[in-house]
Amino acid sequence: MALFKSSKILSSVGSQTPVLAVLQLRASSWWTEVQMGPPDPILGVTEAFKRDTNPKKMNLGVGAYRDDQGKPFVLSSVRKAEAQIAAKKLDKEYLPIGGLADFSKACVQLALGPDNEVLKSGRSITVQTISGTGSLRIGANFVSRFHNASRDVYLPKPSWGNHTPVFRDAGMQLKAYTYYEPKTCGFNLKGALDDISKIPEKSVILLHACAHNPTGVDPRPEQWKEMAALIKKRNLLVFFDMAYQGFASGDIDRDAWAVRYFIEQGHNILLSQSFAKNMGLYGERVGGFTVVCKDAEEAKRVESQLKILIRPIYSNPPMNGARIAATILNTPELYKEWLQEVKGMADRIIRMREMLVSNLKKEGSTHNWQHVTDQIGMFCFTGLKPEQVERLINEFSIYMTKDGRISVAGVTSANVEYLAHAIHAVTK
């Protein structure tokens, strides 16, 4: 019977080959309308770098720390924490929806300080998330579902590229406020205040807690104070993104200053945290999302809804990275070592900034490069124009994003002179 049916099929298509007949009988594609998406701008830089055979090539696009030999760096405190965890021979059972409790508690304590009134009163809730991106998305989903007063979220201009799709895909309406001043490669306080004064009440405003990405430009404490007062006057909901605590200045308290100050001034903030950079746990995806509430009862209600949001997305977070971070944060000797290592990473980046400016002067550059050392954190907005970036890529095999942002973590004692020479060549 099967053979009969097969022969009928073949005869019905006349002189066509059996292969063509089978292809015609297949269902048409469901996905003919799907267009090819654009490549990720950061990953595209890395792919081009990999194809380059120039021995002097530099990849200044990727936001991951490198040591002074240009190699990936695993912290000693992380290795020791891993050894302690392995020795315990722990199980691999599911974590609760909200994550590892020891981690969540230590995570928010690191951000707010262990003696913060918010923690003592129990009026905050922290859930473990899938690093900073996961934290932002859970936060965006929460705001989208429960902040009925406004669908608008105001991002600094510019902001981290992923902020836009995270909030957009959560159903928020994207707006912007002035932040960066291209003429000075610094912070535009007047522009920021002017724009914030016009933001409709109860809108959401996103703030980078420290080491603004991509510019490396942070407000000074007195500027933060002006912003906090105006934001409170405008009755805006503050969403802090803190991906670089300790990694910016080398001091965890200094880097968390803005977050703590806003809370002191009565802002019930949302807070996203990541341990990718400051613990080097990039692939472990360790983060936290915190909501500061009116009181403990409100915090419990918020927690219940966060769990409901998390459950259909990833059910519960991964445990290994959270165990590592919790072990470091809760073990005094490891915590002390980690603080030293964080400062060491931050200090190396600061030193590379200084060496770059020094070598630019040696090259004879007459441009003002003070913004390179004024900026803070992993990234530097160089002020280079797109055509200058193209020359750096094509003539010197120095790869970066088109906006002139460089990852200072990719600069080393061995290649900083070459970088300065190349920048001078395209800017003189």
UniProtKB/Swiss-Prot annotation:
Entry's transmembrane regions: none
SUPFAM superfamilies given in the database record: PLP-dependent transferases
Signal peptide feature range: none
Gene deletion effect: Morpholino knockdown of the protein results in brain developmental defects. Morphants show a small head and seizure-like electroencephalography spikes. Additional defects include slow circulation, bend body and pericardial edema.
Annotated EC: 2.6.1.1, 2.6.1.7
Gene3D superfamilies given in the database record: Aspartate Aminotransferase, domain 1, Type I PLP-dependent aspartate aminotransferase-like (Major domain)
GO molecular function: kynurenine-oxoglutarate transaminase activity; L-aspartate:2-oxoglutarate aminotransferase activity; pyridoxal phosphate binding
Highest taxon of source: Eukaryota
Catalytic activity: L-aspartate + 2-oxoglutarate = oxaloacetate + L-glutamate; L-kynurenine + 2-oxoglutarate = kynurenate + L-glutamate + H2O
Alphabetical list of Pfam families matching this protein: Aminotran_1_2
Family: Belongs to the class-I pyridoxal-phosphate-dependent aminotransferase family.
Subunit structure: Homodimer.
Additional record remark: In eukaryotes there are cytoplasmic, mitochondrial and chloroplastic isozymes.
The name this protein goes by in its record: Aspartate aminotransferase, mitochondrial
Annotated gene: got2a
